[in-house]
């Protein structure tokens, strides 16, 4: 039986329910984590981080030709369909300048993470080239291990360590470099206490005890920063002005709709020429990203058609 997942992008490969028999063939580790729902249907034990990791391994191998993928304990294990949605909507945004999705786009992923998920999907789906930035040396090592373990990715994905505390684009975008877009899944919480409380809520909702590990665990830099998501994105907006001619579209996920008004005000303050909001939905989960540019329509057309 196949059921549509409401709201996923038309090009997303995950509209139907997971074909667990096929995914277990791709990654036999997954079989031990299968469960039955109250309706008697086979599912995955999503409360178990090892199950989610095994599912991700299978999905990335089966749909995105990533045969070797792993992350260290304690790092975020992202849901693949939602991450793919961001990539596909970003592709539509890039296509607006010329009418077609650019095949050789250069993308900057702010906070690439130990999982390297956005570059892996973007390289496979569109042949894009990625630069991934990261503050954590452990996350960077994990992402590099994934790249090195899969033929062809070394030519498509490069990584850079953000050494400047509090900086986002500064120190990462080099002089004379150009990017079609940046993307980011920013830290959500405004303190370690808030991050712990959020994890505790999810624990209770899943009926887990305190010692159970969770697939939405994560390192400090993945979960929180001073001032939370709004402060992080506002800092990104402030810095983006300095790279107005080097980047066509700056984008970031925004977890809550109520966080948008202060971000729109910040974008007005820096003189953004155009601001776009893309709504997304994965099942019951609503999400969105905002995009802004300092280039007008004609400048964006010229940028897309530039010599690379």
Curated annotation (Swiss-Prot):
One of its GO terms (molecular function) is 23S rRNA (adenine(1618)-N(6))-methyltransferase activity. GO terms for biological process: rRNA base methylation. Pfam families: Methyltransf_10. Its EC number is 2.1.1.181. Coiled coil: none annotated. Keywords: Cytoplasm, Methyltransferase, rRNA processing, S-adenosyl-L-methionine, Transferase. It is found in: Cytoplasm. It comes from the Bacteria. InterPro entries: METTL16/RlmF, rRNA_lsu_MeTfrase_F, SAM-dependent_MTases_sf. GO terms for cellular component: cytoplasm. It catalyses: adenosine(1618) in 23S rRNA + S-adenosyl-L-methionine = N(6)-methyladenosine(1618) in 23S rRNA + S-adenosyl-L-homocysteine + H(+). NCBIfam families: PRK11727.1. Specifically methylates the adenine in position 1618 of 23S rRNA. Belongs to the methyltransferase superfamily. METTL16/RlmF family. This is Ribosomal RNA large subunit methyltransferase F. It comes from Escherichia coli O6:H1 (strain CFT073 / ATCC 700928 / UPEC). The lineage of its organism: Bacteria, Pseudomonadati, Pseudomonadota, Gammaproteobacteria, Enterobacterales. The gene is rlmF.
